[in-house]
Amino acid sequence: MSRLILASASAARRSLLQNAGLAFESLPVRIDEDAIRQSLITEGATPRDIADALAEFKARKATERAPGHLILASDQILALRGEIFAKPRDREDAARDLHRLSGHTHHLYSAAVIYEDAKPVWRGVGTARLSMHTHSEAQINAYLDQAWPDVSSSVGAYHAEGLGAQLFSRIEGDWFSVLGLPLLQVLSYLRMRGMVAP
């Protein structure tokens, strides 16, 4: 029987799968996310499609290293009024991102793709809308004093499941997608494959 391989180094994604009782192995892969994202933006791709494409690139890369198994890869895109955000390069970049998100509602798109035998066999995208309180520069800096560098690898420079929850007035949609993986959709597919108890 095929093993489930998570093509990610994300502790949050590993935790979601572990807490859901799944047996899997982690196989982190590296792709040039910035170049791929920028190319897709230039082509006019939607945030949803960009998340899906990045997840597929990761799955394809991992299947080269683990043929014959189910490869699960995921990616998350943050969009504010059509602008796509990347992970912050440094603390100053994080402060700028939080300032731009402050007082607005943005969307998170978390895509997952499963590859088997070098081709995609399933894909899904979860979405969430996050409304952020208006924050002063001093409030943003006080938040980053506590949260940085833990949030350096997170688009938007926050962890909504932790201290970052204080930044928001409202979160709607798929909570698991806020955490980086459309978990319920993934579990539905794996249940059909007999990899999850009924």
From Swiss-Prot:
Active site residues of this protein: 75 (proton acceptor)
GO BP terms: nucleotide metabolic process
Q: What class of enzyme is it?
A: hydrolase
Q: Which residues cross the membrane?
A: none
**Principal place of residence:** cytoplasm
Query: Catalytic activity, per the record?
Result: a ribonucleoside 5'-triphosphate + H2O = a ribonucleoside 5'-phosphate + diphosphate + H(+); a 2'-deoxyribonucleoside 5'-triphosphate + H2O = a 2'-deoxyribonucleoside 5'-phosphate + diphosphate + H(+)
**Statement: the UniProt record of this protein carries the keyword Hydrolase:** yes
User: Which PANTHER family does this UniProt record tie to the protein?
Assistant: BIFUNCTIONAL DTTP/UTP PYROPHOSPHATASE/METHYLTRANSFERASE PROTEIN-RELATED (PTHR43213), BIFUNCTIONAL DTTP_UTP PYROPHOSPHATASE_METHYLTRANSFERASE PROTEIN-RELATED (PTHR43213:SF5)
Under which name does UniProt file this protein? Nucleoside triphosphate pyrophosphatase 1
Q: Which organism is it from?
A: Jannaschia sp. (strain CCS1)
